[in-house]
Amino acid sequence: MKLWQNNEHDTEITFYEAKNKCSDAAIVIFPGGAYAMRAEHEGKGYAEFFQSIGVNSFVVDYHVAPDYFPQPLLDARRAVRFVRANAEKYGINPEKIAVMGSSAGGHLTAMLSTYYAPIEGEDVDELDKVSFMPNAQILCYAVIRNPDTGISHEGSFRNLLGEKYDAMNKAVDPALIASPKTPQAFIWHTAADDGVNVINAYDYAASLKRCGVPVEMHVFPDGRHGLGVAPDFPHVAQWTGLLKNWLEYIGWKNEE
């Protein structure tokens, strides 16, 4: 399905219906790929996991470079608005919409959860009157920190911002702009990740804690970057079960 009703924006959102549905929540998924591409195993792969545990999900093919900021964020806001506006159609509670992303998709997830300023390109139709604020965020080895920290994934920021890189990289650092309005979070990462430093996760969790935002975080000692559901790393693969438990803990999923 197309998120925008004009030819200028071709963003697609794909619905994955739960098998044996046992939740009225929905997960909106933004795959990773350094804002240069979108990795299928971090989109469809996650959606298939949610299908298996009875939770509806949506995968968003948001814009990437050379379609720079704010277009990816416009797409992300539009996706949440679409799901919320169509909640009855999909059997979803409009106040139980989580956003989820890995790597750069994790940055988009966290940016959506923390960056609230109006953006040129909104207010194109009635859908833009619907709230874009998610009710929870799920971050998998997410890019968070800006390049000046020394622990950033610089390529993701450059692909997101283009010519706005120098002027805006701190403005889109979720650890700097989190607030008490930021939604609750589930975060996981691996300490051995040499693509995105695990301190990104620690810093964001600490920022959320300072803002009084509930956060659950898991760090596994081993495992490379980009694992997805981690089928070849049994110890890391526990994260999916931990996420299922968290959804039950916050009241978003019935216990099996």
Please provide the spans of the model-predicted regions.
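Short beta-strand/loop motif that positions the catalytic acidic residue
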Residues: K181, I187-H189, D193
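N-terminal cap/lid segment of alpha/beta-hydrolase-fold proteins
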Residues: M1-K21, I151-S152
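Mobile cap/lid helix-loop segments that gate and shape the active-site cleft of serine hydrolases
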Residues: Q5, A142-I177
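C-terminal catalytic histidine-bearing segment of alpha/beta-hydrolase fold enzymes
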Residues: Y202-E256
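Conserved alpha/beta-hydrolase "acid-adjacent" motif
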Residues: D194-D203
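Catalytic nucleophile-loop/oxyanion-hole region of alpha/beta-hydrolase
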Residues: A39-E40, G45, F58-P94, F233-Q238
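Primarily recognizes the serine-hydrolase "nucleophile elbow" in alpha/beta-hydrolase
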Residues: R78-S152, N169
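Short beta-strand element of the alpha/beta-hydrolase
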Residues: D24-G32
